[in-house]
């Protein structure tokens, strides 16, 4: 399909640099889905609480999305002179086109819709920072992404029309702002919690997969995951957070033997039809930013 135009402005970014960041985004998606065992989520062992998707769907989806990540970076660069709050409007058509390719690659299965939003924002932020010759760090990337999303929660969640979306309903009922709120706040769960936790575990010499699984537990314990709440209600969300925190309090995931606790947690999530997809999306961002 034809790609939406980015801007009439030109970018000075090298294609090799753009492709390098796009490759990191693809690797981040693959790293997350291949990580096993993950409670309630699709991984190399099973399909978690999902009956409509499998590991191969995520592999195809990630490849389809990778082709669009350079467009987000390019738009971020080309729109560098725009006010940041005007950028999101220009990103939407790119995101919708990317989403269309994802659905075509998976025969209609929603594998990475959340990641298109979050990785798209971060890639656009990287493009803007590079174009402006500003420092590209996890903190500056997330702060720039937040500036794109200023007012997003108010505009899209705080509405009183009769046809509420799932996100609007969860916001009104439980006060959960989901992916929009996390983006508008500059991804504090990643910047202040998951990323430093993951990097500390790596510095301590922990196996990277075990470190990432432990970081997933941290996200599950702290994230007001709208995916979980939509499937299991407030009770399901509180149960998941409590169980994840209990595992962390008991020492977390430090050895291969600890994976037995995750396998049991996975079985319980499947029985409850709970899948922490929002936390999985944040784990993708955590790994992505850890490489920068």
Swiss-Prot record:
Q: Which GO terms describe its molecular function?
A: ATP binding; triphosphoribosyl-dephospho-CoA synthase activity
Keyword Isomerase found: no
The UniProt catalytic activity note for this protein reads:
3'-dephospho-CoA + ATP = 2'-(5''-triphospho-alpha-D-ribosyl)-3'-dephospho-CoA + adenine
* EC nos: 2.4.2.52
Pfam family of the protein (one) = CitG
The alphabetized list of GO BP terms reads: prosthetic group biosynthetic process
Give UniProt keywords alphabetically. ATP-binding, Nucleotide-binding, Transferase
What enzyme category does the UniProt record give? Answer: transferase
HAMAP family for this protein: CitG
Q: Summarize the protein's role.
A: Catalyzes the formation of 2-(5''-triphosphoribosyl)-3'-dephosphocoenzyme-A, the precursor of the prosthetic group of the holo-acyl carrier protein (gamma chain) of citrate lyase, from ATP and dephospho-CoA.
Q: Which family does it belong to?
A: Belongs to the CitG/MdcB family.
Its protein name is 2-(5''-triphosphoribosyl)-3'-dephosphocoenzyme-A synthase
Q: Name the gene behind this protein.
A: citG
